[in-house]
From Swiss-Prot:
Gene3D superfamilies in the record: Mediator of RNA polymerase II transcription subunit 22
Subcellular location: Nucleus
Organism: Eremothecium gossypii (strain ATCC 10895 / CBS 109.51 / FGSC 9923 / NRRL Y-1056) (Yeast)
Single GO molecular function: transcription coregulator activity
InterPro entries noted in UniProt: Med22, Med22_Saccharomyce
Annotated Gene Ontology cellular component terms: core mediator complex; mediator complex
Lineage summary: Eukaryota, Fungi, Dikarya, Ascomycota, Saccharomycotina
Name of the protein described by the UniProt record: Mediator of RNA polymerase II transcription subunit 22
């Protein structure tokens, strides 16, 4: 991904996270004035139950949205780390890929002579 795509996705994700968090805060401060009323009829109890159930469902939906947003942030940070790590690996030229077997043989013989001493044939 290009830098601009990552930045755009980061902006969208942070905006989504802030909106979901704001909604959760708003839902957590439900007006309790209707719950504290002195009326003991069943209509009020049913409406309080309905509001509470609806509130729980909304909290669940916004919490799920927060979780998805955090997962998106993890994907973005992984992409940034991969880009950073892979950008530090030097690229090899095609000429450097060829193995010089004669040079390897000379180095091996020199190392063997240094380690074991010259071998007489």
């Amino acid at each position: 991904m290009s830098n601009q795509v990552l930045l755009d996705k980061l902006d969208r994700t942070t905006e989504s996270l802030s909106q979901a968090l704001a909604q959760l805060v708003k839902l957590s401060s439900i007006d309790r004035a209707s719950a504290d009323s002195d009326g003991d009829n069943d209509g009020t109890t049913d409406s309080i139950t309905s509001v509470a159930t609806n509130g729980v469902m909304m909290v669940h939906a916004h919490t799920t949205q927060l979780i998805r947003g955090v997962q998106d942030l993890l994907v973005i940070t992984r992409a940034i780390r991969e880009t950073w790590v892979l950008g530090q690996i030097p690229k090899k030229n095609g000429d450097e890929d060829a193995i010089d077997y004669e040079k390897c043989e000379r180095l091996l013989e020199k190392a063997m002579d240094d380690f074991f001493g010259p071998v007489a044939l």
